[in-house]
C-alpha cells in the first residue's frame, strides 16, 4: 500500500499543491500594504531628515551667528560659510551655501548648531532642473525655513524632551 500511495502522491503533485496553497494563503489573500505614492504619503517622524532650512527669530532676524560649527562638523564638506563682523560686534553670514549633491543628510549640522539655525525639514521630495541649482544658497534656505516654520517649531517642541 505504501508504494502505491507514494506513486499517487508523486503523480498528483500533492506536495506542490500543498506549497501553492500555502503561498496563496500568504500572498494572494492578504491585505496589501503598498502605498500609492503620489496620492498617498507615508507618515513621517518629527525627526525625519529631509531638505535643509535656515530659521529666523520671531522678530525676523536670522538665527545663524556664523560660528561655523556646522561647516566644521559636516563629514561630506557640503557647507560653505563666509561671515563678516557687524558694527555692534556680532557676526553674521554673508554666504551660506550647501551643496545638495554632497550632503548626506546625517543631521550633524543640526545637532552642532547652538542656536537651532540650521534644521532638517520633513520635505522628502524636491528636485532640480539644472545642475547649477544643486547649491542651496542662504536666500533659498531662509525661504525654506520661512515656509515650514510652524511645522519646524512643532517638531522641535515634540522632540524637546529627548534633547
Curated annotation (Swiss-Prot):
It is a peripheral membrane protein. The gene is nuoI. This is NADH-quinone oxidoreductase subunit I. The keyword Amino-acid biosynthesis does not apply. [4Fe-4S] cluster 1 binds at residues 64, 67, 70, 113. NDH-1 is composed of 14 different subunits. Subunits NuoA, H, J, K, L, M, N constitute the membrane sector of the complex. Residues 54-84, 94-123 form the 4Fe-4S ferredoxin-type domain. NDH-1 shuttles electrons from NADH, via FMN and iron-sulfur (Fe-S) centers, to quinones in the respiratory chain. The immediate electron acceptor for the enzyme in this species is believed to be ubiquinone. Couples the redox reaction to proton translocation (for every two electrons transferred, four hydrogen ions are translocated across the cytoplasmic membrane), and thus conserves the redox energy in a proton gradient. Its cofactor is [4Fe-4S] cluster. GO terms for cellular component: plasma membrane. It comes from Halorhodospira halophila (strain DSM 244 / SL1) (Ectothiorhodospira halophila (strain DSM 244 / SL1)). [4Fe-4S] cluster 2 binds at residues 74, 103, 106, 109. GO terms for biological process: aerobic respiration. It holds the Pfam family Fer4_7. It catalyses: a quinone + NADH + 5 H(+)(in) = a quinol + NAD(+) + 4 H(+)(out). PANTHER family: NADH DEHYDROGENASE [UBIQUINONE] IRON-SULFUR PROTEIN 8, MITOCHONDRIAL, NADH DEHYDROGENASE UBIQUINONE IRON-SULFUR PROTEIN 8, MITOCHONDRIAL. Binds 2 [4Fe-4S] clusters per subunit. Belongs to the complex I 23 kDa subunit family. It comes from the Bacteria. It is found in: Cell inner membrane. Its EC number is 7.1.1.-. Keywords: 4Fe-4S, Cell inner membrane, Cell membrane, Iron, Iron-sulfur, Membrane, Metal-binding, NAD, Quinone, Repeat, Translocase, Ubiquinone.
